[in-house]
Amino acid sequence: MATTTLTKSAATVLLAHTQCATATVTIGSAVDVSTKLGPATAFVKMGRTVSNALGNQVRFRLEGSAKTSGNDEWVPIYEWQSLNGTTAASKTTLNDAACDAGDTSFTLTSGTGFTAGDLIYLRETGTPANSEWCRGKSTSTNTVTIEEALTRGHTNGIDVTDLAELFAIPVDTSGHVRIRLVVDTASAASGQTVDVIAWLVTVDSASTA
C-alpha cells in the first residue's frame, strides 16, 4: 500500500511577539504561499497584560492576497475575536528565583484565581520573545503546577496572568499567493494592551512511495 509523506515548513512567522496597544491595528508579516500545497494552519496566541477586563474583544483577521506584492488586494479569509477578553483576569507576579527551563511548577506572589485548566501567560518585558504560554494543572496556595515543562527559564518578578487564549485556524493556501494576520484593537477599542504571537505551518511537498 502506497504511503504519502508530507514535507512541511514549521513555525513561519505570521506575527512576531507584539504588544498590541488599544486602538491600534497591528499587521503581521506577509507570508508567500504561492508554491505551497493546500492545507495550512495558523497558530495564534494572545496573553493578557493586566487584570482589568478589556473594553471590547480583540478582533483577528487572516487575510489573503491575489498578488505577489502591494497592499491593494488583501481580503479577509477568516475573521474571529477573543473569547474571554471582557472577563477580568487574575494577575500576579512570579515569586520564584529559580524558575528554569524544564520546570513543571513555579511559585507566584499570589495564587488566587489560578485554577486547573487555566491558560497562563508569563510576560517577559526585557526580552518579550522569551514570554511563554502554559496550561495550569493544579494550584496549591501560591504554587502552580503545569501540564508540560517550561520551554524557557523566567525572570523573577515578571507579570503572570491567566485567561490567555490560543487559536488554531485551518486555511487552504492553494487559492492564495500571500497570507497575513491582522490584530485589530481599534474597530472596538480593547482599552488595554494584549500580547500576540502567531505562526503558520504549511505543506511544501508530498511524495508517495
Language-model-derived ranges and their functions:
Residues 84-104, 109-118, 123-173, 183-188:
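Small/polar beta-strand repeat architecture
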Residues 46-57, 68, 128-129, 185-192:
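Extended, low-complexity, turn-rich repeat/linker tracts enriched in Gly/Pro/Ser/Thr and Asp/Glu
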Residues 26-47:
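Contiguous beta-strand segments within globular domains
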Residues 1-17, 36, 183-209:
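C-terminal interaction-tip segments
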Residues 24, 30, 70-80, 130-133:
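Tryptophan-centered short beta-strand motifs
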Residues 40, 56-60, 118-120, 132, ...:
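Short beta-strand/loop motifs in extracellular/secreted proteins, especially
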Residues 58-88:
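Terminal beta-strand-rich extracellular "head" domains
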Residues 38-44, 171-192:
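Noncatalytic modules at the cell exterior or secretory-pathway interfaces
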